[in-house]
């Protein structure tokens, strides 16, 4: 893997520049800028309908400095596969506008609605056909662009407009899909979770993903101040707490001889080695209005215990897979 340093990345021009209309404090712009810093040269981006798409391409303006294609909600991976196949054909025939470039990075961005739910069929097929591209999941844990509706990525207990917290039902009643495990089960060569609170880790993982010959998957937690109900200046802080509480652990998974090999990233490895440093789930939930029913009008110990036990179990399983 090519060396990545913060100094070099800071000097590299941004692929996503000013003019975006995303909400104040939106983590998606941070994720995209960090991931795009890791590209090697000519790059083509496909973008599913969602917050990032509608806010960076308001006609007749664009915030993108690279070729960029707006896709439907459900087909961003399919469009990326078509681009990648076209590039291969140009290289094989040694003709066409992209034939002169030895490498053209293809990156697909989509939210959790376009990944967990509406776009999963296309994503699954594109991975199994082994197209060479990097898929970046920008997970803000709901359909934020259309009004904060629950998605397959919405966590247990979260209050949304379609899973409102009330006296009878305390927010979403189901757990979120284990999307990373689902993608790993496809035999995907490289899967990693990323968090903008650790920018160098993001860029190193993005470069690893891009350099792999085949489909790769980056899963970014993208805190949403509007949907999660926290002050916009706390975006990175809330994201950091997600990892420090093991709600969103950081790891990598690569395939070796047909077997998935897990490796915890530094922030999560430190917790595995020193379990007492793991923060309780309340530290994360208390920051967000979507979970205020866990604490008001009275503290709901049963809900907190259920969620804490679920997180602890998933964390223990991940540590076992990583051999720590």
Language-model features, listed with the residues they occupy:
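Short, conserved beta-strand edge motifs with alternating hydrophobic and charged residues
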Residues: 137, 192-194, 217-221
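Acidic, Ser/Thr-rich peripheral helices and adjacent loops at domain boundaries
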Residues: 152-172, 235-249
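Short gly/pro/ser/thr-enriched loop/turn and capping motifs at secondary-structure boundaries
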Residues: 53, 140-145, 225-227
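Cofactor-binding active-site loop characterized by glycine-rich and histidine/acidic residues
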Residues: 3-135, 148-158, 172, 185
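A structural motif
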Residues: 170-188
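Ligand/cofactor pocket segment of small-molecule handling proteins
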Residues: 167-171, 188, 193, 206
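Glycine/aspartate-rich loop-and-adjacent alpha/beta segment that forms the canonical ThDP
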Residues: 202-324
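Active-site glycine- and acidic-residue-rich loops that bind
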Residues: 113-117, 195-203
């Amino acid at each position: 893997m090519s060396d990545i340093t913060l100094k070099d990345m800071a000097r590299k021009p941004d692929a996503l520049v000013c003019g975006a209309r995303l909400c104040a404090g939106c983590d998606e712009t941070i994720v995209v800028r960090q991931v795009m810093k890791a590209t090697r040269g000519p790059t083509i981006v496909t973008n599913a309908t969602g917050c990032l798409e509608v806010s960076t391409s308001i006609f007749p303006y664009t915030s993108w400095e690279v070729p960029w294609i707006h896709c439907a909600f459900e087909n961003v991976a399919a469009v990326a596969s078509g681009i990648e196949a076209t590039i291969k054909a140009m290289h094989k025939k040694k003709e066409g506008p992209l034939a002169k470039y030895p490498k053209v990075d293809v990156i697909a961005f989509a939210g959790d609605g376009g990944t967990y739910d509406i776009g999963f069929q296309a994503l699954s097929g594109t991975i199994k056909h082994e197209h060479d591209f990097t898929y970046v999941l920008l997970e803000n844990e709901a359909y934020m662009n259309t009004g904060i509706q629950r998605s397959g990525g919405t966590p247990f207990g979260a209050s949304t407009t379609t899973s409102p917290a009330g006296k009878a039902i305390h927010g979403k009643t189901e757990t979120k899909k284990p999307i990373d495990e689902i993608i790993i089960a496809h035999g995907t060569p490289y899967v990693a979770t990323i968090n903008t609170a650790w920018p160098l880790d993001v860029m190193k993982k993005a470069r690893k993903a891009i350099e792999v010959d085949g489909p790769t998957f980056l899963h970014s937690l993208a805190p949403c101040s509007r949907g999660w109900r926290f002050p916009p200046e706390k975006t990175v802080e809330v994201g950091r707490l997600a990892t420090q509480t093991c709600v969103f652990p950081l790891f990598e998974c690569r395939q070796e001889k047909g077997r998935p090999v897990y490796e915890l990233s530094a922030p999560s490895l430190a917790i595995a080695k020193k379990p007492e440093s793991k923060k309780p789930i309340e530290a994360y939930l208390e920051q967000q209005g979507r979970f205020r029913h866990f604490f008001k009008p009275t503290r709901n110990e049963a809900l907190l215990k259920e969620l804490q036990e679920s997180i602890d179990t998933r964390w223990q399983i991940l540590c076992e897979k990583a051999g720590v």
